[in-house]
Design a protein with these regions (language model features):
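Residues within membrane-spanning alpha-helices of integral membrane proteins
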Residues: 9, 54, 110-113, 117, ...
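Transmembrane helix-loop junction
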Residues: 39-40, 94, 98, 107, ...
Length: 259
């Protein structure tokens, strides 16, 4: 276990649980956990934080993928095709992540956070509206493999936060899936991106395993709670919490970066 204060450890456990909670409902749990790791380990090499984040995320994402697969019809062949490309893309992204410094990583994460915040604010119906459906053509599948697979997979391995949300958006727009189908497919693809990146981080020895195991337990618990709360209160409640949390994280990261 890294040498950290009890307060920092508690903060990370809460962030891991909250990340699992949000991931289970709307995706984007990495938007909480990775910034929290950056705040908890401001002088640590970012590659170790990225690798630890992946080790935690794959546990909650796998559980969510199983849940979605049981409750929603999923085109497994399509998900596997996109997932295979995503695995390759994420492994490549993780390879380049070793050279990223915290001075570069913080502004990038802030940009991602602001982009997601703008989308959530401008699209308050996200998660409740019903996108148009249509036939999945070979061309659309190819675009999905390129964008959701290689492109977002590379981003997930390189940085990570927001990948689940980006996957849902891309799959909905490109394949014209409804939101439930897109979420189900995204979870399967996200497991592949997490696995590809985690293997690369593990090979490079940039995973804090003892910390990851502890945080994974809280992430899994948060995901279980999130699934049940989503059924009771709806995704609008979680989106509100996400907006408040993202604003707070952007403010703190900006303070650490420039003040």
């Amino acid at each position: 276990m890294p040498d950290i204060s009890l307060l920092t450890l508690v903060m990370l456990c809460v962030a891991a649980a909250a990340a699992g909670w949000i991931d289970a409902v709307v995706g984007g749990g990495g938007l909480l956990l990775l910034p929290a790791l950056l705040l908890g380990f401001p002088h640590h090499q970012p590659a170790y934080l990225l690798g630890t984040n992946k080790a935690v995320a794959i546990v909650g994402t796998s559980a969510a993928a199983v849940t979605y697969a049981r409750k929603s019809p999923v085109d497994v062949r399509l998900a596997v095709r996109i997932g295979a490309a995503a695995l390759a893309g994420s492994a490549l992204g993780a390879f380049f992540a070793a050279g990223i410094s915290s001075e570069v990583l913080r502004p990038v994460i802030m940009g991602v956070l602001l982009a997601v915040l703008a989308f959530v604010v401008l699209r308050p119906s996200f998660g409740t509206d019903a996108p148009a459906t249509g036939p999945v053509t070979a061309r659309r599948v190819a675009v999905a493999v390129g964008v959701a697979g290689l492109g977002i997979g590379f981003y997930d391995g390189l940085i990570g936060p927001g990948t689940g949300t980006f996957l849902v958006l891309a799959l909905t727009a490109v394949l014209q899936l409804n939101l439930v189908q897109a979420s189900a497919t995204a979870k399967i693809v996200n497991v592949c991106t997490n696995f590809g990146a985690l293997v690369m981080f593990a090979v490079q020895g940039t995973v804090l395993w003892s910390l990851a195991v502890l945080l994974a337990v809280f992430n899994l618990g948060g995901g279980w709670l999130g699934a049940h709360m989503a059924l009771k209160k709806g995704s609008g409640f979680v989106r509100g919490v996400l907006v408040v949390t993202v604003v707070g994280l952007v403010a703190k990261l900006a303070y650490d970066q420039w003040l």
